[in-house]
Amino acid sequence: MVQLVTERDLRESLEAGLQETLPAGWRAQFSPTSASDDPQIDGVLDLVAPTGETSQAGVIFKARLEPAQISRELPWLTKYPTSLVVAPRMSARARSLLNDAGVSWYVPGGDYRIAIRGLFIERLVQQSKRRSAGAPDTRFVADLFAGGALRVVRWLLIEPGRSWSVGDMAERTGLTLGFVSRTLKTLARDAYIERVRGATRLTDRDALLDTWAAAPSPPQSAFERVATVDGPEALLRMIRAFTTPSPYAVTAEAAADKLAPFARFSRVEMYVQDVAGWDRALGLTTVPRGGNVVLIKPVDAGVFDGSFERDGVPLTSRPQLYVDLVRRGGAAAEAAAFMRERGALWPQ
């Protein structure tokens, strides 16, 4: 898609695009505003329904639009009953912020969501393209929810009320200062955090957690096993009794049951580094599916970050547990919602 950067190009593209997308019988006319009118908008869009009813929206053209910019400008973006923002590109995060604020948006030649009184039109087909790790622009990380960047995200969610310096986060995650700095810049760009005089604070923990849960799952190996024990609680007692030098952490329904009991669970899932060691310790038998034990060997060792004990059993961090439950869907996702509603996700 051609990147339009001038107001004139954006205006002409909007006018042409509306002619193609408006329902039959609808008409639209754009009128630019002068400096003496309202300096906060670039024009007014008049929409005429087939019934003759007219509605208006203030139009704002942006050559560049980042989520952090939207957060700063929301007070005047929502000043009018209806507003329409037009920009050559909009990230998923930018669109989400505008949707939540009730602001319509339009990407020339791409997607749009316009809700102005009796008119609602939407096109959501284009997938945002992720920048490859080798792309020239290295001010930001390519993916917040993979690799080292996810370790930063995870710690922000584990301690959402804490103020972090770059050095603090680098020490906690074991990442370089430069990589941590780029990750925090990306989070600030996407309006998840605020950075003031070297201090970083999480400002939208719910949106960050939900975006992580919706991101693709990392590649990891899950091994189905059967343990000949009398129920999952007996299995947890065996796990608790086993001494191992390598880290492990229980996740999914078995872990959620320790924090916010929701429903009976029949199997135990756990992150481990030594699969063979656990096979021997618990006398596990390999099965293709339907086991009562699942040993997950993660590619990302960050799944162990922030793990804690409950009833003598190490559990993965609360944010990691929530994401794991949501991604499993079904009853597990319901358990995640229950955990959040009960305040077990971020206890006071």
PLM regions with names:
Residues 196-223, 227-234:
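Extended amphipathic alpha-helical segments with heptad-repeat/coiled-coil character used for oligomerization
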Residues 79-106:
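Nucleic-acid nuclease catalytic cores
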Residues 122-151:
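Short alpha-helical segments that sit at the start of domains
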Residues 149-211:
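Loop-centered beta-sheet repeat module
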Residues 219-302:
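Short gly/ser-rich loop at a beta-strand->alpha-helix junction or flexible surface loop bordering the NTP-binding
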Residues 39-79, 83-86, 322:
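Conserved catalytic cores of phosphodiester-cleaving nucleases, focusing on short active-site segments
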Residues 278-348:
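Hydrophobic alpha-helical interaction segments
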Residues 1-35:
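Acidic-basic catalytic patches of nuclease active cores, encompassing PD-(D/E)XK
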